[in-house]
Curated annotation (Swiss-Prot):
One Pfam family here: PKHD_C
Binding site for Fe cation: H97, D99, H160
Record SMART domains: P4Hc (SM00702)
Gene3D superfamilies xrefs: q2cbj1_9rhob like domain, Rabenosyn, Rab binding domain
NCBIfam families: PRK05467.1-3, PRK05467.1-4
Cofactor: Fe(2+); L-ascorbate
Protein name: PKHD-type hydroxylase Bphy_5374
E.C. code: 1.14.11.-
Domain (Fe2OG dioxygenase): residue spans on this chain: 79-179
Sorted UniProt keywords: Dioxygenase, Iron, Metal-binding, Oxidoreductase, Vitamin C
Length: 227
């Protein structure tokens, strides 16, 4: 399931965050944090994990997502890996790969299972060429290039890549979510069911039908969730 999450940050918030990141001296070679599979195909820059600016900006992003009902519905978050930040420019790219299954949070000993991958775009799409995120799913390859402040949520099991940036610079945040429901098919069913309930609420639909659907939703969540 691939879901676009609009307006995680306003355009002004995204621009201010990008400016602070661009001015930072904490950028390092992105291969420093890549795994065995990713390192040979990863060519980008990244804000060092655990740096003060990464922690500050990451906290802002997580706080905004916690208030975003579409993100909650799609990801059903249990744990969120502290957001990271990357930059692509001058032909930089990231070849096709699958994210590692488990991420160790630096300095904490905590582990996060990467059920859901998230990319939050911070650069307006007209300011750079290339840089599309390509995600392979059951319906083929999905090409993603969103407005600044919008995010894309997709299964951590997906093959994905970032095309070379040939003009300008693409700055984004990326991170992972350990979901209450680890299986993507089950999450997709719950997402569709929640959407149907919300539409019934908005249209003042049949109350008995709404109660039945709400009951089904929570019983399925109870059956499938890990806390």
């Amino acid at each position: 399931m691939i879901v676009s999450i609009p307006d995680v940050l306003s355009p002004a918030e995204a621009a201010a965050m990008r400016a602070q990141l661009e001015a930072s001296d904490a950028w390092v070679d992105g291969r420093a944090t890549a795994g065995y599979q990713g390192a040979p195909v990863k060519r980008n820059q990244q804000i060092g994990e655990g740096s003060p600016i990464a922690l500050e900006m990451g906290d802002r992003i997580v706080a905004s997502l916690e208030r975003h009902p579409l993100f909650i519905s799609a990801a059903l978050p249990n744990k969120v890996y502290p957001p990271l930040f990357n930059r692509y420019e001058g032909g930089m790219h990231f070849g096709s790969h699958v994210d590692g299954a488990i991420r160790l949070v630096p300095g904490s000993g905590a582990r996060v299972r990467t059920d859901v991958s998230v990319t939050l775009f911070l650069t307006p799409p007209d300011e750079y060429d290339g840089g599309e995120l390509l995600i392979e799913d059951t319906f083929g390859v999905q090409e993603v290039k969103l407005p600044a402040g919008h995010a894309i949520v997709y299964p951590g099991t997906s093959l994905h890549q970032v095309r070379p940036v040939t003009r300008g610079a693409r700055v984004a945040s990326f991170f992972w979510v350990q979901s209450l429901v680890r299986d993507d098919t089950q999450r997709a069913m719950l997402f569709d069911l929640d959407g149907a309930i919300q539409r019934l609420n908005a249209s003042n639909g049949d109350e008995a039908a709404r109660r039945t659907l709400v009951g089904c939703y929570h019983n399925l969540l109870r059956m499938w969730s890990d806390t």
